[in-house]
């Protein structure tokens, strides 16, 4: 433990000052989850040792690891036998992995919030010393329809329960592309008006700047709902953070990059977090992700602010 702490404290002195302190959007995959997602039974997955090595190569001290247990309940996939047992196993495996590097990694549990077991699993995670810090919800993977009042009410219940457990929430807000769910300003307002107020006392991190990676007019319309709320000092936004995970894509036009930079300034760089997503290929490794993010027309002071931001749930 002492050796790991010393390494973590020494890292900033041995790498560029521009390296982020924390990667706020990472995933580990158990061999079982990797086989499920890739369709390859021999898939080894991504473990904590691999991730920490990638963080070291990027000069990044820590990472927020978002469990992918929700993928066992993916709405567009055929049902899995003993689904809830797989969800628990994936959350537990993630907890075991991060426990190997307690000074470097922090885990959030996950599940499909529309499933009958959702509140039971949240309660179970709240009692786990490695998972009690927070919850990851993926509206796209779970096919949360923000135009469906029953879906909205159920997700609100999950938010209220997480607030009661004092668990932070990371939410992939973009609805299902596979199922062609509507998404834009109207759906973002539903989240702001009907779901977010269920968790007034805990931090909420909106992933991918309210998108799913990249940046287009649809994402911009949704994000605009939140930047407008920030501009009018809406109290519902006081604990909201945004990760800019895989926003900048190769070949992105200068005009798009400028739009993203403008939105980041409207959000406020003090609440924008760096994230690189699952390290499934060299192009998505933390170091490569930061290099892509650096293409944005932000000032060096703004990059330093984003790199140094430390959200409450990783302190």
Describe these PLM feature segments.
Residues 45-54, 116-126, 259:
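Short, acidic/polar
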Residues 40-46, 71-73, 83-87, 112-119, ...:
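Acidic-and-aromatic substrate-binding clefts and catalytic sites of carbohydrate-active enzymes
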Residues 17-24, 28, 32-62, 266-273, ...:
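Mid-to-C-terminal alpha-helical segments outside catalytic/metal-binding sites
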Residues 21-24, 65-66, 108-109, 136, ...:
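Active-site neighborhood of phospho(di)ester-bond hydrolases with catalytic His/Asp-centered motifs
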Residues 77-183, 246:
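Active-site gating/metal-coordination segments in enzymes
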Residues 4-13:
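Sec-dependent N-terminal signal peptides
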Residues 38-39, 44, 49-77, 104-112, ...:
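Divalent metal-dependent hydrolysis catalytic cores, especially in the metallo-beta-lactamase
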Residues 132-134, 147-273:
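Catalytic pocket-lining loop regions of alpha/beta-barrel enzymes
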């Amino acid at each position: 433990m002492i050796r790991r702490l010393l390494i973590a404290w020494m890292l900033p002195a041995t790498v560029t000052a521009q390296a982020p302190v924390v990667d706020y959007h990472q995933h580990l995959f158990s061999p079982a989850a990797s086989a499920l997602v890739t369709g390859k039974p021999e898939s080894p997955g991504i473990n904590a040792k691999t991730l920490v090595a990638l963080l070291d190569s990027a000069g990044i001290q820590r990472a927020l690891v978002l469990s992918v247990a929700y993928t066992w309940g993916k709405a567009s996939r055929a049902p899995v036998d003993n689904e809830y047992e797989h969800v628990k196993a994936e959350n537990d495996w993630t907890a075991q992995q991060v426990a190997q590097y307690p000074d470097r990694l922090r885990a959030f549990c996950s599940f499909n919030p529309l499933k009958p077991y959702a509140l039971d699993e949240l309660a179970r995670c709240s009692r786990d010393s490695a998972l009690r810090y927070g919850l990851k919800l993926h509206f796209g993977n779970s096919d949360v329809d923000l135009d469906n009042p029953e879906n909205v009410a159920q997700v609100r219940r999950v938010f209220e329960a997480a607030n009661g457990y004092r668990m932070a929430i990371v939410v992939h807000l973009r609805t299902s592309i596979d199922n062609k769910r509507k998404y834009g300003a109207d759906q973002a307002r539903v989240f702001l008006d009907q779901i977010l107020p269920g968790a007034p006392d805990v931090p909420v991190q909106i992933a991918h700047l309210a998108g799913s990676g990249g940046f287009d007019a649809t994402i911009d319309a949704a994000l605009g709902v939140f930047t407008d709320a920030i501009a009018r000092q809406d109290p519902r936004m006081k604990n909201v953070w945004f990760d800019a995970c895989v926003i900048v894509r190769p070949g992105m036009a200068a005009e798009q990059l400028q739009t993203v930079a403008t939105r980041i300034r409207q959000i406020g760089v003090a609440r924008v977090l760096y994230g690189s997503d699952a390290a499934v290929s060299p192009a998505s490794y933390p170091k490569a992700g930061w290099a892509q993010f650096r293409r944005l027309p932000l000032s060096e002071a703004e990059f330093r602010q984003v790199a140094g931001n430390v959200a409450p749930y990783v302190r």
